[in-house]
């Protein structure tokens, strides 16, 4: 890949969270940037407001002329784009410089010291925490994130990397084996629960990909993994450490105390204890995320005091246990959880902060294949809520699979307080229920209901005051 003669960058799927981060990087580095997406969203509107040309019809007639000049345009696409996409096929068949998002991310980060955050769950929160710590420490830091951070209201940070100074924090995404394009100096693996079995032929192939990711570690690099993550440490790693609650962990999480909606804990290592580590978000999964970010920043050279202060000031990520509405009578939490393990962690975190409260969950399953592959696990996780409104499966890139429906999933859930709802009936059904906490969860288009549900909460109890 050579950017010497590139003046314009065109992104097919520009509204995706990872793609939009690349779009913003190129725009802030003075490239002409534009792209296509299937539907308008808050994110695409933000990109347009930042000066990028975005359209929503798959047609070369819609592509501005500047992005059709073969010698000066770079075309980037996401693997979520269907194979019959007209624009993608035009650029491919006519020999344009065409790359996947992951290839471009690998290219942009290869000459810089990189922290790669991998794992089925928690990548975005951990990456955002690590980036915030590095940024607050004064160390030059760039970050390509899979969510909008509350601290910076963006999914990208751009640092001054003159003479290769500082660090890049990048999400190492296992989907489509994208993380094999990265060569991290510090490789973090938070967890390794099987997912994306529509991409991987079987569970073992999924696990094997993480070993392949670690082989990409730069010579002398460091591996940080949760203690129960079973991987092969490459011989060229200079150090491999584990973290977790277990006595076997090199860095052991201790003294976990839930208070005021957040968590305080300590980390023990050999004869050293780091006390009073505080995050302003609930859940043991976030304690794990924070510990991974803590260790990544520690090995990158940030002081312990600076790490602790930054974790305390970390404001979270949009759609990751995000409080949409909160007062003394009613709380509304929105979350991106779309895997059974994530749903379980979300519901346990809600129980941790709001013990004894009645919880209603609105869940939109994401992908027919994921619903099929984890049907029993979804049923077990969703049984943790008091009442369930289950939406129809969001197909994303997939066609329906016979016998895989929300009704089939509903029948497996060991609960009587449950119902399948359409998008049209969701608000009406929710309005009928009494609850103390309402949760929306999913990775599809459930986020379009956030504001209507917030309005319902306000109509019931007035403006939020917490």
Swiss-Prot record:
It is an enzyme of class 6 (ligase). Pathway: Cell wall biogenesis; peptidoglycan biosynthesis. Transmembrane segments: none annotated. ATP binds at residues 119-125. Its main location: cytoplasm. It is found in: Cytoplasm. Pfam families: Mur_ligase (PF01225), Mur_ligase_C (PF02875), Mur_ligase_M (PF08245). Gene3D superfamilies: Mur ligase, C-terminal domain, Mur-like, catalytic domain, NAD(P)-binding Rossmann-like Domain. It catalyses: UDP-N-acetyl-alpha-D-muramate + L-alanine + ATP = UDP-N-acetyl-alpha-D-muramoyl-L-alanine + ADP + phosphate + H(+). Keywords: ATP-binding, Cell cycle, Cell division, Cell shape, Cell wall biogenesis/degradation, Cytoplasm, Ligase, Nucleotide-binding, Peptidoglycan synthesis. One of its GO terms (cellular component) is cytoplasm. Its EC number is 6.3.2.8. GO terms for molecular function: ATP binding; UDP-N-acetylmuramate-L-alanine ligase activity. Belongs to the MurCDEF family. Cell wall formation. This is UDP-N-acetylmuramate--L-alanine ligase.
């Amino acid at each position: 890949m050579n950017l010497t003669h590139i003046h314009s960058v065109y992104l097919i799927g520009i509204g995706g969270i990872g793609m939009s981060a690349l779009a913003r990087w190129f725009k802030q580095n003075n490239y002409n940037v534009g792209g296509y997406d299937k539907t308008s969203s808050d994110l695409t509107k933000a990109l347009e407001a930042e000066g990028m040309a975005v359209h929503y019809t798959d047609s070369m007639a819609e592509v501005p002329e500047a992005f059709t000049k073969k010698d000066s345009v770079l075309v980037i696409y996401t693997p979520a784009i269907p194979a019959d996409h007209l624009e993608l096929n035009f650029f491919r068949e006519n020999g344009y410089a065409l790359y996947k998002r992951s290839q471009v991310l690998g290219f942009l980060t290869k000459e810089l010291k990189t922290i790669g955050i991998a794992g089925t769950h928690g990548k975005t929160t951990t990456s955002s925490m690590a980036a915030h710590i590095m940024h607050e420490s004064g160390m030059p830091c760039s970050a390509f994130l899979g969510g909008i951070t509350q601290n910076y209201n963006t999914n990208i940070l751009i640092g001054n990397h003159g003479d290769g100074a500082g660090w890049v924090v990048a999400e190492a995404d296992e989907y489509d084996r994208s993380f094999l394009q990265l060569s991290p100096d510090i490789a973090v693996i938070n967890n390794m629960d099987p997912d994306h079995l529509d991409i991987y032929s079987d569970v073992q192939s999924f696990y094997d990909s993480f070993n392949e990711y670690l082989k990409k570690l730069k010579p002398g690099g460091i591996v940080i993994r949760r203690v129960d993550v079973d991987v092969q440490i490459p011989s060229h790693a200079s150090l491999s450490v584990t973290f977790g609650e277990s006595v076997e962990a090199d860095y052991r999480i201790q003294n976990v105390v839930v208070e005021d909606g957040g968590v305080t804990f300590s980390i023990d290592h050999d004869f050293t204890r780091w006390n009073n580590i505080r995050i302003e978000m609930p859940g043991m999964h976030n304690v794990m995320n924070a510990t991974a970010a803590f260790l990544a920043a520690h090995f990158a050279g940030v002081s312990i005091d600076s790490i602790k202060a930054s974790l305390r000031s970390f404001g979270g990520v949009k759609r990751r246990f995000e409080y949409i509405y909160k007062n003394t009578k009613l709380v509304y939490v929105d979350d991106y959880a779309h895997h059974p393990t994530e749903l379980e962690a979300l519901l346990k975190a809600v129980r941790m902060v709001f013990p004894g409260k009645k919880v209603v969950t609105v869940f939109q399953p994401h992908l027919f294949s994921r619903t099929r592959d984890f049907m029993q696990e979804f049923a077990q996780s969703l049984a943790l809520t008091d009442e369930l409104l289950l939406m129809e499966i969001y197909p994303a890139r997939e066609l329906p699979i016979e016998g895989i429906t929300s009704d089939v999933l509903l029948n497996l859930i060991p609960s009587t307080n449950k119902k399948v709802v359409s998008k049209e009936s969701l608000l009406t059904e929710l309005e009928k229920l009494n609850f103390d906490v309402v949760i929306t969860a999913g990775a599809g288009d459930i986020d379009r209901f956030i504001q209507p549900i917030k309005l319902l909460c306000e109509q019931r109890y007035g403006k939020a005051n917490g």
